[in-house]
């Protein structure tokens, strides 16, 4: 069994959609980034790539490449899954946390989980997503941005 860790953070700005786990969440701000800036999926992808010793999302989907501009991170997650399969790994589980002062994310977590399950072709019970705040402290607590952390385990076939 192998373990991978992922982390991502993006700045909250006006005139952008807030996409987390492939879900568009109603909010007055969204995350700034080259793609859709989905910090949850970016952290998950980095944890999976790390567990398989395949680098990180910047290596596979560089922000200098215009073909990834505005792309859905669900599509990128599907591409990561192809790499995992090609390299003969099986996903055992994923555990992630989203750190955001606002908006409240609990109502969207089940849909996020379903989106990830579908993109990776794994069962719902192999995925856990939590949301928390920093109690008004720091970058996310000050509502300047949103971050996410993910850990996963994979097994070599």
From Swiss-Prot:
Cofactor needs: a divalent metal cation
Cystine pairings recorded for this chain: none
Catalytic activity: 4-CDP-2-C-methyl-D-erythritol 2-phosphate = 2-C-methyl-D-erythritol 2,4-cyclic diphosphate + CMP
GO-annotated biological processes: isopentenyl diphosphate biosynthetic process, methylerythritol 4-phosphate pathway; terpenoid biosynthetic process
Gene Ontology MF term list: 2-C-methyl-D-erythritol 2,4-cyclodiphosphate synthase activity; metal ion binding
Cofactor note text: Binds 1 divalent metal cation per subunit.
Pathway field: Isoprenoid biosynthesis; isopentenyl diphosphate biosynthesis via DXP pathway; isopentenyl diphosphate from 1-deoxy-D-xylulose 5-phosphate: step 4/6
InterPro entries: MECDP_synthase, MECDP_synthase_CS, MECDP_synthase_sf
Record keywords, A-Z: Isoprene biosynthesis, Lyase, Metal-binding
Keyword Transferase annotated: no
Site residues, Transition state stabilizer: 34, 133
Annotated signal sequence range: none
Binding of a divalent metal cation, residues: 8, 10, 42
Biological function: Involved in the biosynthesis of isopentenyl diphosphate (IPP) and dimethylallyl diphosphate (DMAPP), two major building blocks of isoprenoid compounds. Catalyzes the conversion of 4-diphosphocytidyl-2-C-methyl-D-erythritol 2-phosphate (CDP-ME2P) to 2-C-methyl-D-erythritol 2,4-cyclodiphosphate (ME-CPP) with a corresponding release of cytidine 5-monophosphate (CMP).
Protein name: 2-C-methyl-D-erythritol 2,4-cyclodiphosphate synthase
Gene name of this polypeptide: ispF
